Amino acid sequence: MKINNYIIRRKSKKIYIKNVPIGGDSPISVQSMTNTCTTDINSTISQINKLQKAGADIVRVSIPTLEAAESFKIIKRNVSIPIVADIHFDYRIALKAAEYGADCLRINPGNIGKLNRIISVVSTAKEKKLPIRIGVNSGSLEKDIENKYGINNPKSLFESAMRHVNILEKLNFDMFKVSVKSSDVLTCVQSYKLLASKIDQPLHLGITESGSMLHGSIKSSIGIGLLLSEGIGDTLRVSLAADPIEEVKVGFSILRSLNIRKRGINFIACPTCSRQEFDVINVVNVLEKRLEDVITPMNVSVIGCMVNGLGEANRADIGISGSRNKSILFENGLRNNNKINNEEIIDKLEKYIRKKVKILNLKNNC
């Protein structure tokens, strides 16, 4: 399937996590994961709702104990977004999560246990019509595979995934997606490429334990971006040691940068130099914060001088090009007769952007 003029998407089977389609011709979905203690029910519900408001399509919740599974039961009743139950070590927790309304089960081949336990989980998933995610991670590989290939080897992640893909296929279960995550970008990318060439199940993209807000965003953007640019990937999570809401923002920014899926404002801003006629950095940072609630796709250019300001403004929905004392406003590439006083750019530009959002929304709803 052709996504745009540059990307042809890999053909994959379509599955559903509640009402969200994954794979096939579905939009590439953005996921995040709660970092609250699951037994803190109110905090977990609150964070799930915030993630949904931020644009997450799916939220994953860790269930480390049977006690947490009881909390999950209450949490699930009080949220509407699709929830993936994240299960490690104890297969009984997966059975409980399925009973309590999970929309998908994530199991880790490296620690879920023997074949009979996997069969039990798959049997329950079949009964409940629940999809499963086979979530392979370089930090928790099966010991025999780790000894065979080592940790940061694409073949180790691939073999672990295929071992469990084969098990699920033998059990006539095809409602599953797969991830092969490593904290090493190139290992991760090559693992996904191996997997994409072998199976047609949906692939969940991510760089595991990628790091802080800054470095994790960079690593995830490179790794996930490389795969998406080759048409690989059906859903993604940007893993950051940061507020999970930032994961959603970065995820959509990656998709927007590749013209795969657009949500919210794409700010085009110059890095600034001595030619700038107003404080570009402050203007962009303040506007990004003020306009976080905008989900309508649009391009806004904020350029501090006339060198590139006119050209960028010509291609934007709303653009400002720096000029002495008063800067030039553009809408749909056309110069607006009203210049904006440089001291008032933030407030005036926000006003014009929100007005444009209303116009675009009316147009889209016609």
Swiss-Prot record:
Which GO terms fall under biological process for this protein?
isopentenyl diphosphate biosynthetic process, methylerythritol 4-phosphate pathway; terpenoid biosynthetic process
Q: Which domain of life is it from?
A: Bacteria
Q: Which cofactors does this gene product need?
A: [4Fe-4S] cluster
Q: Where on this chain does [4Fe-4S] cluster bind?
A: 270, 273, 305, 312
Picking any one GO molecular function of the record gives: iron ion binding
What pathway does the UniProt record associate with this protein?
Isoprenoid biosynthesis; isopentenyl diphosphate biosynthesis via DXP pathway; isopentenyl diphosphate from 1-deoxy-D-xylulose 5-phosphate: step 5/6
Q: What class of enzyme is it?
A: oxidoreductase
The Enzyme Commission number assigned here is 1.17.7.3
Enumerate the catalysed reactions. (2E)-4-hydroxy-3-methylbut-2-enyl diphosphate + oxidized [flavodoxin] + H2O + 2 H(+) = 2-C-methyl-D-erythritol 2,4-cyclic diphosphate + reduced [flavodoxin]
> What keywords tag this UniProt record?
4Fe-4S, Iron, Iron-sulfur, Isoprene biosynthesis, Metal-binding, Oxidoreductase
Q: Which InterPro entries match?
A: Dihydropteroate_synth-like_sf, IspG_bac, IspG_bac-typ, NO2/SO3_Rdtase_4Fe4S_sf
Q: What does the note under cofactor report?
A: Binds 1 [4Fe-4S] cluster.
User: Any idea what job this protein has?
Assistant: Converts 2C-methyl-D-erythritol 2,4-cyclodiphosphate (ME-2,4cPP) into 1-hydroxy-2-methyl-2-(E)-butenyl 4-diphosphate.
Question: What is stated as this protein's family in its record?
Answer: Belongs to the IspG family.
The cross-references to PANTHER family, in alphabetical order and at most eight, read: 4-HYDROXY-3-METHYLBUT-2-EN-1-YL DIPHOSPHATE SYNTHASE (PTHR30454), 4-HYDROXY-3-METHYLBUT-2-EN-1-YL DIPHOSPHATE SYNTHASE (FERREDOXIN), CHLOROPLASTIC (PTHR30454:SF0)
Name of the molecule in the record: 4-hydroxy-3-methylbut-2-en-1-yl diphosphate synthase (flavodoxin)
